[in-house]
Structures are given as structure tokens and as C-alpha cells.
Amino acid sequence: MFQNSFLHKKFISTIEKNNLLPYNSSLLVSFSGGQDSLALVKILYDFKNIYNWKISLIHFDHRWRSDSMLVSKQVIKYAKMCNLSVYYFECPKYLNTEETSRKWRYLTLINTAYVNNFNTIVLAHTATDKAETMLSNLFRGTSLDGLSSIHWSSQLSNAVHLVRPLLNCYRSETSWFCRKYFLPVWIDQSNYNNSLSRNRLRQELIPYIKSYFQPQIEQKCYLLSSLISLDVDFLEQEALRIYSLIQHEELLAMNYLVIKLLHPSLQSRILKIFFISNLDLNLNSIQISDIILLINQSISTNINISNYILGTDGTWLYVGAKTKCIKSN
């Protein structure tokens, strides 16, 4: 057992500072066989007895590549070598896009953790992933939330939370770690298919930026994303606090006179909270802008949104079905 590398020390400092993986935790670790997940499993295994962690692995075979079965066999072989149990899932054939497969993967992760009494799902996302996601979202057009979308931890339910303990580590560091300990990294050839925008960003754009503009682009993106996260957390907490004070006790309605006094940033966040929590509707920016215009200019015209009617009545901004207000949950 080796626990003396700088990455071991960085890992322990991180989980203790952020209280990510307490003693006696039961961990379900997503394991692809790539360098990041191999480094994560190796480090967790090295500290397993010290922290009394119960560790199991979960592997997803998307069957998109001809060598996917060989990868799965290697993953299972490595799990047996470490005396760790592994859950293996094949992606249904009808899920043939990255987005649908990602949703299936996360739902399967959560369900497996819940059914088998794991209290923590562990993912191997790194600071490099965070930088790539930030740039990718920026190019597509996003809000502050999209620039800080990968977090240290997320509470998925009362029983299960998700953590990313390598989020301040870089891909160059996990690569070094795997070479140092001779870990059997499986190279995913699809990562070099530059017809995919994410791969082109990783293989061409970021190296170009490093060479000609900012050698520490990953570190700069990570720092910026972390600073944005602080602002996003504050705005979200403030929006939740105000929403709890202005919502109607019985009907789907809010005091729009109070909303009218707020900054547009808080107005939009409160509206998103209102529609997601009550109607499970994720409004787009145009719909949000229309509602804010309705509020700020006290327009009496109703707005139709997904079979609901949004209007104002006295001091209330309400959601109605036909002529009746809907009762709150």
C-alpha cells in the first residue's frame, strides 16, 4: 500500500477540509477504466482501511465501441484484484445519444445506491473537466449557473449524496499518478475523434490557448468557476429566502409587488424556483423576460405558459387553470 504521493496528500487534505467522505461511509464509485477513475479507485483503496470505507464499483458499458466488452472485462478484473465488488450495466440500445445515455447513467447510479444502501456516489471529475465544461457551456451560451455547473458535492436525496473528490486535481496529475503506480489505463480511442466538439476543445483549442494565450488556462477557469459558485450560491439562497416570504399560503401565487422591487437577477431566480417547485416547469429566458415585463409594468394581460395562465390580481402574481387558481402542494 502506497500513500506517499502528492496526490494522496492532496486528496486527504481535500476530503477533510470539505468533509466529503467521512469515516464509515459506504461508497459507490463510478469506474470507466480511464486514468481519472483509476486514480480515484487506487487512492480510495489505499485509504479504505484507515477510514473504514465500504467500497463498490459501478461500470457502464454503452456498447458504442468495438472494444467496449474488453474494457468491461478489464474493469471487472481490476475490481477482483482489489477485492472490490462491481455492478455492471449495459446501456439499452435505444439510448443512442450522449444526453439520453447520461440521464440513464445517473438514474442507474442513484437507483443502485439507494437499493444497495450506499450513502455516497463518488465520481472522478477533475478540475480539467470543470474547465472544459465551463468553456463548452460558454460557447453554447449560458448563465452564471452554467459557468459553475460542477460542484464538490450534491445532495440527491435524504439518503444519498454525490461527491467529486478530485475536483481540484488536473488530468496531467492523474496521468502522472497512473504512470507512477503502473495502473492499467484503457485508452478510449473515441476521445480522439475531433468531429465531436468536446474532443476538439480538449485536443485542439485548449492546447492552442496554452501555447499562445494562457499556459494555465485550466487553473484560471477553475478559479473563475469557483468564484462564480460563491455568487451563485448567495443569489440562490437569497432567492429562496425571499420566495418563502412572498408565496401564497394556499394558492399558486406570489406577492408581485415585492418582486417588483427586486433586482432582475433575483426576479428571474424566484420565478424559476416558483415554476420548478410547483409545476416542474423549467422556463426559458424568453418566458422569464415576458413575466418580468408583466410584473414591472403591471400589465393586466395574461400569459399562457404550458397550458397554464399567468396573471396578476391585486397584489398577487398567480397561476390559473381556466378561471380558477390552482392550490399549492
From Swiss-Prot:
It comes from the Eukaryota. It is found in: Plastid, Chloroplast. One of its GO terms (biological process) is tRNA modification. Its EC number is 6.3.4.19. GO terms for cellular component: chloroplast. Its main location: plastid. The N-terminal region contains the highly conserved SGGXDS motif, predicted to be a P-loop motif involved in ATP binding. Ligates lysine onto the cytidine present at position 34 of the AUA codon-specific tRNA(Ile) that contains the anticodon CAU, in an ATP-dependent manner. Cytidine is converted to lysidine, thus changing the amino acid specificity of the tRNA from methionine to isoleucine. NCBIfam families: lysidine_TilS_N. This is tRNA(Ile)-lysidine synthase, chloroplastic. It comes from Pyropia yezoensis (Susabi-nori).
